[in-house]
Structures are given as structure tokens and as C-alpha cells.
Amino acid sequence: MRLILWLPVLVVVLLMVMEGPAPAQGAPDVASTFRNIPNSLKEFGNNLKDTFESIPEATRKLMTSFAEGIKNFRIPLL
């Protein structure tokens, strides 16, 4: 009975051993990485600028919606 239970495990282990080690990852090209840094920084700066420019409009919309909510708020009479 034990042999029947261990047989699938043995098959899987043998398949893993026969497969061998996983292939190594290729080394990244350092020169292309350094060439891409200025573009990445420029894109990050543009995204940051756009985000900060949208803050006043988003704040204005939020305050307007709060003002509308307060204006429409009614306290029920007891």
C-alpha cells in the first residue's frame, strides 16, 4: 500500500531531476538602462506636474459638492 502512495511522488521527483536546472536570466544591458533614465525622469516629472496642476480643480469640485450637500441638508423637526 505504501509503495502505491509513494510511486507518484517518486515519478514527479525523477521528472524534476531529469529536467535539470532552470536557465539563467539574461544579464540586463546596462548601457540601455542608463540611456532610458533621462526619459523616465522626464515622464515622471510631467506626470507629477499634471497631478499638481489638477489639485486646485479637484479641490474646487469637492468644496462645491460639500456646499451643495450642506445647502440641501434639512434637520427634521421633532
From Swiss-Prot:
Cite the GO molecular-function annotations of the record.
fatty acid binding; phospholipase inhibitor activity
Q: Does the keyword Secreted apply?
A: yes
Annotated localization: Secreted
One BP term from GO: lipid transport
**Keyword set, alphabetical order:** Lipid transport, Secreted, Signal, Transport, VLDL
- GO CC annotation: high-density lipoprotein particle; very-low-density lipoprotein particle
Record has Cell inner membrane as a keyword: no
Q: What is its main location?
A: secreted
Instruction: From the UniProt annotation, give the residues forming the signal peptide.
Output: 1-26
Summarize the protein's role: Inhibitor of lipoprotein binding to the low density lipoprotein (LDL) receptor, LDL receptor-related protein, and very low density lipoprotein (VLDL) receptor. Associates with high density lipoproteins (HDL) and the triacylglycerol-rich lipoproteins in the plasma and makes up about 10% of the protein of the VLDL and 2% of that of HDL. Appears to interfere directly with fatty acid uptake and is also the major plasma inhibitor of cholesteryl ester transfer protein (CETP). Binds free fatty acids and reduces their intracellular esterification.
Give the similarity note: Belongs to the apolipoprotein C1 family.
Entry protein name: Apolipoprotein C-I
Organism per entry: Panthera pardus (Leopard)
Q: Upper lineage ranks?
A: Eukaryota, Metazoa, Chordata, Craniata, Vertebrata
